[in-house]
């Protein structure tokens, strides 16, 4: 058993059994210890203390790599002990708190590290349960990966005081990422039972992990059920700033039913989807004047390889902004 210190305001340690997993894809405690130390040194340590961790000859990280190369458990334990003592000293003298106070947005590697810790402890051991979906229905499971999601947050300008909603939120990855990376109020709705159960496990672990890392995330809300019928989701959509809909595998019927909900969304709300709700050649005309899609101004964007879980290749996504001005202008032009 090895204890690795977190950089928060309490006496929190993560406990690790130094075992080698049978399967190469299973959780590797030694790798996680190294990654925790790497992440802490990059995000929590003031510049004037960085050399103790980063020095290429004598730094904690270099000594840790040397211990691994020597396959020496005693050497490894000694380095982790020195790391723990350094973190405790910096925590007590206020250096870590000062560093955190100057950080206004978490960088993506830290976000990914925390999300990976959560996922590996909750979803990974039970991932087989997610394979029980039906092709050709709306209940096909697939994940948008953290780097792609971070790009979406930047493209939409999502801010901490805003509201994010993920319709079809699966195991809750994106809901948690929005609350962690942006610090905003974050909602998700999912109807697949297995995914919902894993999402709730992730949410519990998320709260514990944020405490360990000394981070105050936005509030998360995970709702079980049909997002077209759940009243809490219908209500939050009216005040949402950014809505994510991974509609890659949705049936045309569900996509059409979703469109009617756009009427109640506020001006300026941005809807991000993998399939556009507005046909490419669509124009506002007198015969389609009452169509909800006339309220949407759409821009197309590209995502690159390794952005989604179901394919390695890139693709396109769409950001639709609710903007009634074009419809008003057309109506006025008709007299």
From Swiss-Prot:
Ubiquitination of histone H2B to form H2BK123ub1 is required for efficient DOT1 methyltransferase activity on histone H3. It catalyses: L-lysyl(79)-[histone H3] + 3 S-adenosyl-L-methionine = N(6),N(6),N(6)-trimethyl-L-lysyl(79)-[histone H3] + 3 S-adenosyl-L-homocysteine + 3 H(+). It is found in: Nucleus. Residues 14-335 form the DOT1 domain. One of its GO terms (biological process) is methylation. It is an enzyme of class 2 (transferase). InterPro entries: Dot1 (IPR021162), DOT1_dom (IPR025789), H3-K79_meTrfase (IPR030445), SAM-dependent_MTases_sf (IPR029063). The keyword Repeat applies. PROSITE patterns: DOT1. CDD domains: AdoMet_MTases. S-adenosyl-L-methionine binds at residues 141-144, 164-173, 190, 226-227. GO terms for cellular component: chromosome, telomeric region; nucleosome; nucleus. The keyword Methyltransferase applies. In contrast to other lysine histone methyltransferases, it does not contain a SET domain, suggesting the existence of another mechanism for methylation of lysine residues of histones. Histone methyltransferase that specifically trimethylates histone H3 to form H3K79me3. This methylation is required for telomere silencing and for the pachytene checkpoint during the meiotic cell cycle by allowing the recruitment of RAD9 to double strand breaks. Nucleosomes are preferred as substrate compared to free histone. Belongs to the class I-like SAM-binding methyltransferase superfamily. DOT1 family. This is Histone-lysine N-methyltransferase, H3 lysine-79 specific. It comes from Aspergillus oryzae (strain ATCC 42149 / RIB 40).
């Amino acid at each position: 058993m090895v204890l690795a210190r977190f950089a928060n305001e309490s006496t929190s340690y993560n406990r690790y059994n130094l075992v080698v997993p049978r399967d190469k894809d299973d959780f590797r405690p030694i790798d996680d210890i190294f990654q925790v130390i790497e992440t802490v040194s990059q995000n929590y340590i003031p510049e004037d203390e960085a050399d103790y961790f980063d020095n290429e000859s004598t730094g904690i990280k270099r000594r840790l790599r040397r211990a691994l190369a020597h396959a020496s458990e005693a050497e490894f334990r000694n380095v982790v002990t020195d790391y723990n003592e350094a973190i405790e000293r910096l925590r007590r003298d206020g250096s870590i708190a000062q560093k955190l106070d100057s950080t206004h947005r978490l960088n993506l590697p830290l976000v990914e590290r925390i999300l990976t810790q959560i996922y590996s402890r909750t979803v990974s051991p039970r991932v087989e349960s997610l394979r029980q979906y039906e092709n050709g229905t709306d209940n096909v499971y697939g994940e948008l990966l953290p780097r792609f999601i971070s790009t979406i947050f930047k493209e939409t300008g999502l801010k901490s005081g805003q509201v994010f909603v993920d319709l079809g939120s699966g195991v809750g990855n994106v809901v948690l990422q929005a609350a962690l990376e942006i610090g905003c109020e974050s909602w998700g709705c999912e109807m697949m039972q297995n995914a919902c159960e894993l999402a709730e496990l992730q949410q519990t672990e998320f709260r514990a992990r944020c405490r360990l890392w000394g981070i105050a995330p936005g509030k998360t809300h995970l709702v079980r059920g049909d997002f077209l019928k759940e009243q809490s989701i219908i209500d939050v959509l009216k005040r949402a700033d950014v809505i994510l809909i991974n509609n890659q595998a949705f049936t045309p019927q569900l996509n059409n039913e979703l469109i009617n909900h756009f009427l109640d969304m506020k001006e300026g709300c941005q809807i991000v989807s993998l399939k556009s709700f507005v046909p490419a050649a669509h124009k506002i005309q007198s015969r389609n004047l009452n169509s909800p899609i006339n309220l949407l101004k759409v821009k197309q964007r590209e995502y690159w390889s390794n952005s989604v879980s179901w394919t390695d290749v890139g693709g396109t996504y769409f950001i639709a902004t609710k903007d009634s001005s074009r419809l008003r202008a057309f109506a006025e032009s008709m007299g």
